[in-house]
């Protein structure tokens, strides 16, 4: 069996690391334009949340920031959230490796 995902996109915000139950945790949000145009002739963008832990979380928060392009290698993991005595199921992307690819574009002066 294989559970592997590779994403390349632009970080939508700076990354902050916080202490979780089992170590350090960071949530990253990637903006990834689709490879095809919609009915209006423009490209839609998907926003994908990812989670990094411990050293990956620390290194990513120190080296990458909002607007930077990164590559993520990871896996998809199911999760269960209990809200008001009701279970909700979802998926999350777990970052196993984050690679800095390029900086955000410089604003024109």
Residue locations for each model-derived region?
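Single-stranded nucleic acid-binding surfaces, predominantly the OB-fold ssDNA-binding core
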Residues: 1-109
